[in-house]
Amino acid sequence: MTGQSPIEVSAVVLRDASGQVLTVRKRGTERFMLPGGKPEAGESPAQTAVRECAEEIGVDLDPEALRTLGVFTDAAANEADRQVRGTVYVHPAVPVVAAAAEIAELRWLDPSAAPLPQDLAPMLEHQVLPALRDLPAED
């Protein structure tokens, strides 16, 4: 890794009634990750998460319903030799209609699947999914 600062992002865990986690794949990439992205000037991590979910998957999240899962650092999925630091939230289930903006594909993932798919972003696989395994599905 280079000496550059980590790329700051916010992301949201959305789970269905069975506990599956919504993942997205951005156009021109191969890795699945949580919906979310980089902040715009002056945005808080929570504001970034809400805006990105509206843009990427067409859902309006309630900022008051966001619960912080954690802040995780890992290898960036789509930028070689970079780290990403993500503030990750959990939000109650909302209807997800379709991919929008730069999202090419949506996929629901069983976080307890073994083995996990090989096309997951490092932070999702190494940090977020292990943190989720201890939470009830409805959180």
Question: How would you describe each model-predicted region?
Answer:
Residues 1-2, 137-139:
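Actinobacteria-biased recognition of intrinsically disordered, low-complexity terminal regions
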Residues 1-21, 38:
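Conserved N-terminal beta-strand and adjoining loop/helix that marks the start
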Residues 14-15, 23, 91, 108:
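Conserved hydrophobic "DFG−1" position in protein kinase catalytic cores
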Residues 26:
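Short loop/turn segments immediately following the C-termini of beta-strands
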Residues 34-69:
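The catalytic Nudix box helix
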Residues 72-98:
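Active-site-adjacent beta-strand/loop module that shapes the phosphate/pyrophosphate-binding cleft
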Residues 88-90, 98-136:
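NUDIX/MutT-family hydrolases
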